[in-house]
Amino acid sequence: YISKSTRKWLNKSQHTITINHAFDAVITACAAIPRSPIVHEDGSIVQNGTWITQSMINAYKDLHKAKLAHSIEVWNEANQLVGGLYGVGINGVFCGESMFHIEPNTSKLAFIALVRHMEQYNGIFIDCQMQNPYLASMGVIEVPRYEYLQKLHLATDMRMPSDMWQPQGVVL
C-alpha cells in the first residue's frame, strides 16, 4: 500500500535506488540510529542504544559476502547515501533487520523498492519481524503463526533467479 501523499512524493523524488552497492555503509548507518532504552518491569535495561553491535555487524558482513544478507540503498542527487535497509534473503523470503533515513521518507522509499523487487522476482513475503505504526502505515500486516510457517516453508523451498541479489539499480 502506498498512500496518496507518499505516491505524490515519489513522483517528485529525484533519488536513486540500488541493491547491494553499499551494504557496509547501510548497516553502519542503521547501527548509528539513536534508540531509546528498553526497560523491563523490574527496571533492568534490556537494550541501551542499538542492538546492532560490532559483532552483529561483522556477522552480517559475513552473511553479505556469502550472498545471504542484502541491502537496499537510497541516494540523493549529490550521490549521498540518505536511506536504506538491510536483511537476509533466502529464496522467496526476505527478513528485514533494520532501516534508516537521513532525509525524510527515504527509509519508506527503500521499503517500497524492496517490495517491488520481491514482486518482480515472485518472492513470497517480507518478514518485518515486529509490527509498528510506521510499517502498518505502509500496509504491513501481521499473520497468524500457522500461516507464517506455511509461507516460510513455501518461500524457502523456492529457487530464485541467480541475478536477484546482484548489485543493480531499482526503478519504481
Q: Model-predicted segments: where are they?
A:
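N-acyltransferase acceptor-side catalytic subdomain
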Residues: 1-172
